Amino acid sequence: ADIAGALSLEALMGSHSPFDARVTKVRPHSGAVATSANMRKLLAKSQVKKSHVQCERVQDPYSFRCIPQVHGAAKDALAHLGDALILEANSATDNPLVFPDEGDSISAGNFHGQPIAMPLDYAANAICAWGNISERRMSTLIHPSMSGLPAFLTPHPGLNSGLMITQVVSAALVSENKNHANPASSDTITTSADQEDHVSMANFAARKLRTAVINAQRVI
């Protein structure tokens, strides 16, 4: 997503000022700090920056200017999921739990998927945000009054539709992902004669996250 964002910024001849290290220093969310640093690295040899020395253009659209904040928040969400999955993989989720050293067993709730379902839902929102902001950058680039480039990025606008359908397909995919971003973990249903009266829907959360990732990859 950062690479696509940097390429889009270059095509727009956008400002590099939003990626100044001082910006995230005063609001140091880890994902934003990492994204800002990555953008500086990706844009290090850019020739576009020179065009802004005496440029009247102060602010680019949010989808370009807020890349560290949006991409970074998504990275933080995915990091949270990663931490939860590592902890889960190294945990006992059986029922009952057997403690041989004490000669004891306990029937409890370590099998419940809520600690994973909620981070999975959080990650789906992150993936949705990546797709949303990428599609908005694409829309800007094909819009001549916004980008200064030929309509739909074709040398023969009007005669050829260029990348018009690419943006239409991306819009459809990000709209689908908004549904996948709806939390599965807020739902529950009773089973087993009301003995299992609260379930996490973690499996569904994982499946819709997988679909959201595939859709977002296509957009980016």
List each model region and its residues:
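Accessory "access/gating" subregions that flank catalytic or transport cores
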Residues: 9-132
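P-loop NTPase catalytic cores that bind/hydrolyze ATP
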Residues: 5
